[in-house]
Amino acid sequence: MTEKVAVLLGGTSAEREVSLLSGQAVLAGLKEAGINAHAVDTRDVSVTTLKEEGFTKIFIALHGRGGEDGTLQGVLEFLGLPYTGSGVMASALTMDKLRTKQVWQAVGLPVSPYVALDRRQYSEMAANALLATFTHLGLPLIVKPSREGSSVGMSKVNTLSELPAALEEAFRHDDDILVEKWLSGPEYTVAILGDEVLPSIRIQPAGTFYDYEAKYLSDDTQYFCPSGLSDEKEQELAGLAMAAYRAVGCSGWGRVDFMLDSDGAFYLLEVNTSPGMTSHSLVPMAAHQRGLTFSQLVVKILELAG
């Protein structure tokens, strides 16, 4: 049977616009390699029709809910269609930053100090009790929804007076949020392709932190690959990335994000099971450092589909 690939893009999540860019880039890369690939916007087309439309393999270029959270993966499993990236369990787990942190803590991997808060707790706690909950974390803080990507709903809190607005913003996007200690060092990201760890990238945003604008819109964000780490630190980071990736059951490809704190220690932030593939994206940058063109990268990811 001739292979016919659906590149799933767009969707309905808060990361729709990024996904459209990722998907079109992936589509162009696959076509450059001579693969019979077609764009499918899951906002407009039901994925349950993919098999009857003759598609034999699925490249997931969706980000966020409905594409990266295990629900789509479950449908594709039911249809018997091979797809790129992690399976149902790992996709669902890593979409939830809190549960991911809990797994990493259980196996002894380093995560930044945090407090988890749900909407019910927030509504029932008095203001002074709420503030007391976070005092041991110190200032500044970073507040984020547990189940959003691309830094959607995330805020930095420099003074306690800024905390209520940051909590409200995070709760606009999720019923569970995380309040974390602010880590002062640079951010690093490590891409994984099959069983191979790609070179790390150091991220230097022009603004306060690596938010949505810095990730996708700003030309002022700087990326360093090679990252400038010593060989010893690079090996340490690669080992941590693979351990974190495997602990939550990921497969195929993905990207693990870290912060290096002022104490010289790496702390895990999250795993992306369907990383961005735009002109600003990091996995293509790391793959290029390893000698892979964009087209070769997307073909390799497709070959890893299961």
Swiss-Prot record:
Co-factor(s): Mg(2+); Mn(2+)
EC number(s) on file: 6.3.2.4
Residue sites binding Mg(2+) 2 per the record: 270, 272
Keyword list, A-Z: ATP-binding, Cell shape, Cell wall biogenesis/degradation, Cytoplasm, Ligase, Magnesium, Manganese, Metal-binding, Nucleotide-binding, Peptidoglycan synthesis
Annotated Mg(2+) 1 binding sites: 257, 270
The keyword Flavoprotein is assigned to this record: no
PROSITE patterns: ATP_GRASP, DALA_DALA_LIGASE_1, DALA_DALA_LIGASE_2
Positions of ATP binding: 134-189
Biological process per Gene Ontology, one example term: peptidoglycan biosynthetic process
Pfam families referenced in this protein's UniProt entry, alphabetically: Dala_Dala_lig_C, Dala_Dala_lig_N
Residue ranges annotated for the ATP-grasp domain, each copy included: 101-303
Cellular localisation: Cytoplasm
Catalytic reaction list: 2 D-alanine + ATP = D-alanyl-D-alanine + ADP + phosphate + H(+)
Gene Ontology annotations for the cellular component aspect, listed alphabetically: cytosol
Pathway as given in its UniProt record: Cell wall biogenesis; peptidoglycan biosynthesis
InterPro entries from the UniProt entry: ATP-grasp, ATP_grasp_subdomain_1, D-Ala_lig_Van_CS, D_ala_D_ala, Dala_Dala_lig_C, Dala_Dala_lig_N, PreATP-grasp_dom_sf
Function: Cell wall formation.
HAMAP family reported for this sequence: Dala_Dala_lig
PANTHER family: D-ALANINE--D-ALANINE LIGASE, D-ALANINE--D-ALANINE LIGASE B
NCBIfam families with a match to the protein in the record: D_ala_D_alaTIGR (TIGR01205), PRK01372.1 (NF002378)
Protein name: D-alanine--D-alanine ligase
Biological classification of the source: Bacteria, Pseudomonadati, Pseudomonadota, Gammaproteobacteria, Enterobacterales
